[in-house]
Amino acid sequence: TSPEKPSGVALITTVDGGENSIVVNSGANFDLTEADIEKAREAFKSASIVLMQLETPISALIAAANLAKGCGCYVVLNPAPAPKNPLPQELLRNVDLLIPNETEASTISGCKITDEATAAQAIEIIQKTGVKDVIITIGSKGAIAMIDGKPTLSPALRVRAIDTTAAGDTFCGALCTALINGLDMRSALAFANKASSISVTKAGAQISMPYLSEM
C-alpha cells in the first residue's frame, strides 16, 4: 500500500479475434520497496514457488529473488511487460525459470523470433545469463522449451479466441501449480497450455481463468 497513490489500474481493449492492447497506471505498485519484501519474509518461508513479473521496481524484484532463494523457493520470472533495459545479472542469477513471450524473449536475447528454430536459439542465449530453464510462449501455437537438451514444442489447444487478456498470466499460474504438484516439465507445459487455451475462450481477465474442475 501507499499513502499517496491508489493501487495500479489497467485498461484493456480487445479487437475481433481476441487480441488486446493494455494501458497501465502503475500507481502504488511501483512503490514496492526492499523493506516491504523483508516484511513478507514469513510468507516466503512457507512458499515452494515464487512467481514474479516486471510491474514492480527491479530493486524489489532483486530483493524478492534473493529472499526466495534463501528460503529454498523455486523462482519463476515472467518478464512482462517487455523490459526496456537488460535485466540485471543480480536478478537473473536467482531465477530458476524465465517465461517470456515472443516479444519479451526477442528483447532479452537480441534474437528476433520468427519460428521454432529462432525460439530455440533465443533460449540458448538467455540460458547463458545463468537462468536454468526458459519457456517461450508463442501465442496460439503454444510454448517451446528445452527438454532433455532438445527444443520441444508443447502445442496449445485449438479454440476460438474471444479475449487473450489473461492468457499469459493463466499459463504462468497453471505451470507453477503443476510443478508444485509434482508434474514433470513436459506434463506441466501441457497443463499450462490447456489452462491458457481455456482462458482465451472467455471475456475478461481473472474471471476467464479456469478452475481445476474445468481442466
Can you name each region flagged by the protein language model?
Residues 1-48, 215:
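Conserved N-terminal subdomain of the carbohydrate kinase-like
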Residues 1-7, 78-80, 125, 135-138:
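Beta-strand->loop->alpha-helix junctions that form or flank phosphate-binding loops
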Residues 3, 27-29, 80-82, 103-105, ...:
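Short, acidic/turn-prone active-site loops that include or flank metal/cofactor-
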Residues 9-10, 19-22, 48-49, 73-75, ...:
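Structural motif
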Residues 23, 107-110, 199:
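Residues that scaffold the ATP/ADP-binding catalytic core of kinase and kinase-like folds
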Residues 42-45, 93, 129:
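Structured loop/turn residues at beta-strand edges in well-structured enzyme cores
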Residues 49-121, 140-143:
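Conserved beta-alpha-beta core of the PfkB/ribokinase-like small-molecule kinase fold
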Residues 84-85, 89, 116-215:
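Conserved phosphate-binding/catalytic region of the ribokinase-like
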